[in-house]
Design a protein with these regions (language model features):
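Juxtamembrane helix-start motifs in multi-pass secondary transporters
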Residues: 30-34, 163-167, 226
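Membrane-interface interhelical linkers
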Residues: 1-69, 73-84, 128-141, 172-220, ...
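Structural signature of transmembrane alpha-helices in multi-pass secondary transporters
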Residues: 10, 41, 93-96, 143, ...
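Hydrophobic alpha-helical transmembrane segments in multi-pass integral membrane proteins
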Residues: 45-53, 100-115, 148-166, 207-223, ...
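Conserved small-residue-rich
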Residues: 140-184
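Specific alpha-helical transmembrane segments that line the substrate/conduction pathway
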Residues: 70, 79-121, 167-172, 223-243
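Hydrophobic transmembrane alpha-helices of multi-pass small-molecule transport proteins
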Residues: 40, 45, 99-105, 114-130, ...
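C-terminal appended segment following the main domain
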Residues: 218-272
């Protein structure tokens, strides 16, 4: 069950750094913040990735490039959707486990027991209950689809390289594509990105740790389980918003969503 502890740790670390997103985005802008975080994580992992560097097949480079590109598309979709309706976009982006389970069944030969299937449904229901505000967001759904496909290709690439090489390269691909798009659209600048990499150094360390342990877990365990269990970050995020940020409006209704999530996570961990 090492993979489970790694996934839970990734969820906690993710919640810790992402709880600071709102204030940072308001100050720096969504795209500049996102790009600086991606470059920061990629560069912080680079020394370890170089140490683990070895000859890799063309298939690995193709799969890892696809993974990084699709993750970039997922972030782009979420950024677009958040401009119109942040909560609905974020809520629908968390239906990712459903798509991940479908890809795992179709392409990885994983099995989906009734217990695991119910766990996936409860986790997604809890995420929607926590954040959905009654408006449909195609951007959120697209973000979920792209994110789940990124996870699929990562799962395919990890056995050959290990988690350090793959995570570093995939993040670098995403950072490069986002930077090119941002510079072309004149929505960010290189000095702004560089300045924010340093300003966000603590968040980058937390995000890098979260990334490493997530991919380590994904290398060990089925995609359908890891993709669902990592949603524990939503529970940690709810607790941080209540106790640390003092966001107590509607906490009882949101708390029910957290309970659904926890029930689903227990089922995901359940081994018949």
């Amino acid at each position: 069950m090492i993979w489970a502890w790694l996934t839970l740790s990734s969820g906690l670390l993710n919640a810790l750094w992402s709880s600071q997103i709102k204030s940072r985005v308001q100050k720096e802008g969504a795209l500049t913040f996102t790009i600086s975080m991606r470059w920061g994580v990629a560069l912080s992992l680079l020394p370890f990735a170089l140490f683990a560097l070895k000859v890799l097949s063309a298939k690995w480079w193709f799969l890892s490039t696809l993974s990084g590109s699709l993750e970039c598309l997922s972030l782009w979709a979420l950024t677009r959707g958040a401009r119109h309706d942040y909560y609905s976009t974020y809520a629908l982006s968390n239906v990712t486990p459903i798509f991940s389970a479908c890809w795992a069944l179709a392409f990885l030969g994983e099995t989906l027991s009734p217990t695991l299937g119910l766990g996936v449904v409860l986790v997604v229901a809890g995420a929607l209950w926590l954040y959905y505000r009654g408006h449909w967001s195609w951007w959120g759904l697209l973000g979920a689809i792209f994110g789940s496909l990124s996870g699929l290709f990562s799962k395919m690439a990890l056995p050959e390289s290990g988690f350090l090489l793959h995570s570093c390269f995939a993040f670098m691909v995403g950072a490069f594509l986002l930077t090119v798009g941002g510079l072309k659209g004149r929505t960010t600048t290189v000095p702004a990105i560089a300045r924010n990499v340093w300003a966000n150094r603590i968040l980058i360390v937390l995000s890098a740790l979260s990334t490493v342990v997530f991919y380590a877990a994904l290398q060990m365990a089925p995609l359908s389980r890891v993709s669902t269990l990592v949603r524990v970050n939503l529970v940690f995020g709810f607790l941080l918003s209540y106790f640390h940020l003092g966001e107590k409006h509607g906490w009882k209704a949101r708390g029910f969503g957290a309970i659904l999530l926890l029930a689903g996570l227990v089922l995901v961990l359940w081994k018949p």
